[in-house]
């Protein structure tokens, strides 16, 4: 389980991104780079990281399912993800 502070930090970045999204787009179109640099650093979409919905893990994230590899395996073995079976050959 990820630390609560890390998860809260990611949520804060998401809120800042949503708040400054239109302003950032407008400044890019007008090519006002100095004003763009004055926006908060965390309002940039590149600063956001994907996190597992269940445990908050950042690495090993599977975009298609929204969970990390460990939680994915647990859910798949429990049969909670439709259409996913353990490979056998």
From Swiss-Prot:
Keywords: Metal-binding, Ribonucleoprotein, Ribosomal protein, RNA-binding, rRNA-binding, Zinc. This is Small ribosomal subunit protein uS14. Its cofactor is Zn(2+). Binds 16S rRNA, required for the assembly of 30S particles and may also be responsible for determining the conformation of the 16S rRNA at the A site. GO terms for cellular component: cytoplasm; small ribosomal subunit. It comes from Salinibacter ruber (strain DSM 13855 / M31). GO terms for biological process: translation. Zn(2+) binds at residues 52, 55, 68, 71. Belongs to the universal ribosomal protein uS14 family. SUPFAM superfamilies: Glucocorticoid receptor-like (DNA-binding domain). Part of the 30S ribosomal subunit. Contacts proteins S3 and S10. Binds 1 zinc ion per subunit. One of its GO terms (molecular function) is metal ion binding. It comes from the Bacteria.
